[in-house]
Amino acid sequence: MKLKQRVVLLAILLVIFIFTKVFLIDNLDTSAANREDQRAFHRMMTGLRVELVPKLDHTLQSPWEIAAQWVVPREVYPEETPELGAIMHAMATKKIIKADVGYKGTQLKALLILEGGQKVVFKPKRYSRDYVVEGEPYAGYDRHNAEVAAFHLDRILGFRRAPLVVGRYVNLRTEVKPVATEQLLSTFLTVGNNTCFYGKCYYCRETEPACADGDMMEGSVTLWLPDVWPLQKHRHPWGRTYREGKLARWEYDESYCDAVKKTSPYDSGPRLLDIIDTAVFDYLIGNADRHHYESFQDDEGASMLILLDNAKSFGNPSLDERSILAPLYQCCIIRVSTWNRLNYLKNGVLKSALKSAMAHDPISPVLSDPHLDTVDQRLLNVLATIKQCTDQFGTDTVLVEDRMPLSHL
């Protein structure tokens, strides 16, 4: 081969090498991608659309028993859930046999017991779909539709750490009031021709009730986790102070993650990576209100971070609160599987998947188009943040293999 031909060939090979490196880092590094992640993504997409059907294949088990058996330390529901439609149908239609004020918290909710003894949390509609919540990123009432959308995003991301949620219409006069406790019943009132209630909570006020359209109220129901899995509450290391003029340490100390890594349960095990997964999840939905989080009790840091209470989300599609990503850009680590999944979802796939997943919900359309568009844009921002980390520290440091011992972080 002549020298000139060799030079041309080497130049071509060099261009191919450089292109391959750039392409792989931007579109899935081979060290990050694996066939199982690809198969998992395709399985998720195949089973994405959930039709609410009453029929269960397991005729000897109730939907509540099946959902309870799904729960394990690292997931609330399994990857493949052929019974999901039947369980969500039961959540949306089963007779309410008791209604009470919600469990502890700052926002209005009701605790319902459905036929068969299953507890669910009911969050009422407070805003129309196109209402924009102004102010701080954690401002406003809970958004019931945000709970529904967040659950389906949890499915799409492959986390499987959020309790099941579905939209539901309830008749306050015929379904709730006849079975309501005195404590809940005492908070009912009529505004114009609409039945309303204000419940019992830190911010609940008689002057700020949630009102039905006549007697019919739209809301979301969240499946209560089984009692055999008691929860333990933790202060989120990247929580806000909620005090004007007072910053949390992470808001001014760029080396804050180093301090977090030295404290339990973030010094070993999966919890820190769960925190970072959650930061990505919260950023996509616009949730800046995760000041605490729950895991299962007595887990020694091994159980998942459970994605509860996602209703302070999807408030303002024009607001991008980048500080939600602080765990990601301060620690500059993320699971390989999360990185892979995020890459599979770009180029409009996330918006399409989320819209498809929610299409059969009883309160569909769950989100307005501006919110769906924003989720796609926020995904690009997450990927850009990860790329900044890989540019600075290298992919081998930033992308953490899920099965790798985590004590090195």
Curated annotation (Swiss-Prot):
Tissue spec: Little expression detected in the secretory stage enamel. Weak to moderate expression is observed in the gingivae and odontoblasts. Strong expression in maturation stage ameloblasts.
Disruption phenotype: Embryos show severe stunting and increased mortality at 13.5 dpc.
Localization annotation: Golgi apparatus membrane
Gene Ontology MF: a single term: ATP binding
Annotated transmembrane regions: 7-25
Active site: D289
Enzyme class: transferase
E.C. number: 2.7.1.-
Family as reported in the entry's similarity comment: Belongs to the FAM20 family.
Protein name: Glycosaminoglycan xylosylkinase
Upper classification of the organism: Eukaryota, Metazoa, Chordata, Craniata, Vertebrata
Gene: Fam20b
